[in-house]
């Protein structure tokens, strides 16, 4: 007998979310079916009983999958089944992973797999905002150790009002789109985009989201009680040697502190100095002893190194590379280093460097999006590549990973609002990270701004980005907010808070917090400190190039657009595409046409102005409305005993009656020297109101002979 347990959560606007367990996927360690309207997500979690030998990290894998059947659709492709994860699914995985990962115990190293599957969708409610809640609820009803629960909500600002988990339609009207994950007590993760909002407005949105999350967390706690999973499984994944831990600290801490406070701004030299301390300590042991003790020494020394770095910052205000907490690394920029792309730039900040290129394309280059719930075309693309050599690693480069997709998406969100909505070009920005020591996604934003301006893209305002960090020990009042963090400060610190924006406000943000008890006061300080840093970086950008170039590069495509009444779309295309293809062959231009907002939108692109002008002239002739009294240059299509048929506009023929050819009487058309294929000037003298036929005259354009 199945006896499911159901919990209902009510949103501020009266909509409800239900969490049901005990009915589906009962062999998983935990499973929950979440439902909101007709959107249904099944989240399952399974954990291995034992840790993977030699593992000193949290082997968590989060998968999010949308089934096409959920929305009554067939998958595309030859096989007609779901394939590899889309970018949207990967980004949703990352949102959930980043919220869950910090809350597993530090000494828990068993493999944990979280699977979230969209089984039903209505196209109204957005499933990505529900995935975090579903995953946390599955953990809540399991016996897997987890310091949750958490929940994740989307908060949008629409007409000045904050809305929790807006619908697809509502989100289109929002000027702020923020995903927030939190426990009952603390915010853990934030990511979103916005239309140049202030720091205070961003904080307000976080607070609104957190209040909604508290309700979700309370429901999960009640669910845990009802299921009877308040006591989690016992585990022992770490073997410790307290004497060895003490010995490592006594022998290494002062030396590690000296390196941390030395102010060496060379990452590899610092790494070698820290590594030498550990190897010196290991040298006292035999090879046989090290087989057992080396993993423990590595773990204990990592803790020592972390503490030394943190204490140097908290006690002396000295960072690893010698900077003050608010100081930005040296910046140099260059625009136009590459002659081939339509725009390019180098942005270097300390040991982080991005070489970014911009390519301009036509409508044919748009990216087609065909996910389960997301359809359309994207005209602004940003790709981020992170090769191993950027950190000096000797390893093969594989395909694009989740991290690269996530970092590229953040930079895309930061910049996309500055591309004018009516900009005719499809724009692709590609950031190649050539060096990395922290904040490479923010370097991408800065290099992207420079490259777009170098390409002559008429961006509204330049955008810069900065990554902020935090050092805060539990139970200590003292803390330090760090501007422009290094990779080690990200790894050994408590927060990674990325903020991008123009001079007038924030355009995108991403925050991951690894510590409990982070107050809004600290967040406010971090945001204000980030603003100072952003303004400094913007100054460096505008010193290099103050505004977009007036003209495109010579080898960039040229585009002209025009709109026509939709009833002329067929005339421009022609039967089987004959007319439009003929124009393209004749002129060398690329012509695209689509119906938008009840009008035909035509885009003509080419490598030179002449081919575009020729194509535009031909299109204008096709869509021109014949006017009585206008003079046209037409081609003789056929000759009849009673006159000639003239094509005076593309696709429009009129009769030039024999009596209208000349003032003198003609027996045949040929007497006037007219033959098929000739081009002659004619005047439209009448349009038959019943048949719509056109009557032309040639003689009215000729001098009338005087009467004898």
Swiss-Prot record:
<dbReference type="GO" id="GO:0005829">
    <property type="term" value="C:cytosol"/>
</dbReference>
<keyword id="KW-0548">Nucleotidyltransferase</keyword>
<dbReference type="Pfam" id="PF00575">
    <property type="entry name" value="S1"/>
</dbReference>
<dbReference type="GO" id="GO:0004654">
    <property type="term" value="F:polyribonucleotide nucleotidyltransferase activity"/>
</dbReference>
<keyword id="KW-0694">RNA-binding</keyword>
<keyword id="KW-0808">Transferase</keyword>
<comment type="function">
    <text>Involved in mRNA degradation. Catalyzes the phosphorolysis of single-stranded polyribonucleotides processively in the 3'- to 5'-direction.</text>
</comment>
<dbReference type="GO" id="GO:0006396">
    <property type="term" value="P:RNA processing"/>
</dbReference>
<dbReference type="Pfam" id="PF01138">
    <property type="entry name" value="RNase_PH"/>
</dbReference>
<dbReference type="GO" id="GO:0006402">
    <property type="term" value="P:mRNA catabolic process"/>
</dbReference>
<dbReference type="Pfam" id="PF03725">
    <property type="entry name" value="RNase_PH_C"/>
</dbReference>
<feature type="domain" description="S1 motif">
    <location>
        <begin position="629"/>
        <end position="699"/>
    </location>
</feature>
<dbReference type="InterPro" id="IPR015847">
    <property type="entry name" value="ExoRNase_PH_dom2"/>
</dbReference>
<dbReference type="GO" id="GO:0000287">
    <property type="term" value="F:magnesium ion binding"/>
</dbReference>
<dbReference type="InterPro" id="IPR001247">
    <property type="entry name" value="ExoRNase_PH_dom1"/>
</dbReference>
<dbReference type="GO" id="GO:0000175">
    <property type="term" value="F:3'-5'-RNA exonuclease activity"/>
</dbReference>
<feature type="binding site">
    <location>
        <position position="496"/>
    </location>
    <ligand>
        <name>Mg(2+)</name>
    </ligand>
</feature>
<keyword id="KW-0479">Metal-binding</keyword>
<dbReference type="InterPro" id="IPR027408">
    <property type="entry name" value="PNPase/RNase_PH_dom_sf"/>
</dbReference>
<keyword id="KW-0963">Cytoplasm</keyword>
<feature type="binding site">
    <location>
        <position position="490"/>
    </location>
    <ligand>
        <name>Mg(2+)</name>
    </ligand>
</feature>
<feature type="domain" description="KH">
    <location>
        <begin position="557"/>
        <end position="619"/>
    </location>
</feature>
<dbReference type="InterPro" id="IPR015848">
    <property type="entry name" value="PNPase_PH_RNA-bd_bac/org-type"/>
</dbReference>
<dbReference type="GO" id="GO:0003723">
    <property type="term" value="F:RNA binding"/>
</dbReference>
<comment type="similarity">
    <text>Belongs to the polyribonucleotide nucleotidyltransferase family.</text>
</comment>
<dbReference type="Pfam" id="PF03726">
    <property type="entry name" value="PNPase"/>
</dbReference>
<dbReference type="InterPro" id="IPR012340">
    <property type="entry name" value="NA-bd_OB-fold"/>
</dbReference>
<dbReference type="InterPro" id="IPR003029">
    <property type="entry name" value="S1_domain"/>
</dbReference>
<dbReference type="InterPro" id="IPR012162">
    <property type="entry name" value="PNPase"/>
</dbReference>
<dbReference type="Pfam" id="PF00013">
    <property type="entry name" value="KH_1"/>
</dbReference>
<protein>
    <recommendedName>
        <fullName>Polyribonucleotide nucleotidyltransferase</fullName>
        <ecNumber>2.7.7.8</ecNumber>
    </recommendedName>
</protein>
<dbReference type="InterPro" id="IPR004087">
    <property type="entry name" value="KH_dom"/>
</dbReference>
<dbReference type="InterPro" id="IPR036612">
    <property type="entry name" value="KH_dom_type_1_sf"/>
</dbReference>
<keyword id="KW-0460">Magnesium</keyword>
<dbReference type="GO" id="GO:0006401">
    <property type="term" value="P:RNA catabolic process"/>
</dbReference>
<dbReference type="InterPro" id="IPR036345">
    <property type="entry name" value="ExoRNase_PH_dom2_sf"/>
</dbReference>
<dbReference type="InterPro" id="IPR004088">
    <property type="entry name" value="KH_dom_type_1"/>
</dbReference>
<dbReference type="InterPro" id="IPR020568">
    <property type="entry name" value="Ribosomal_Su5_D2-typ_SF"/>
</dbReference>
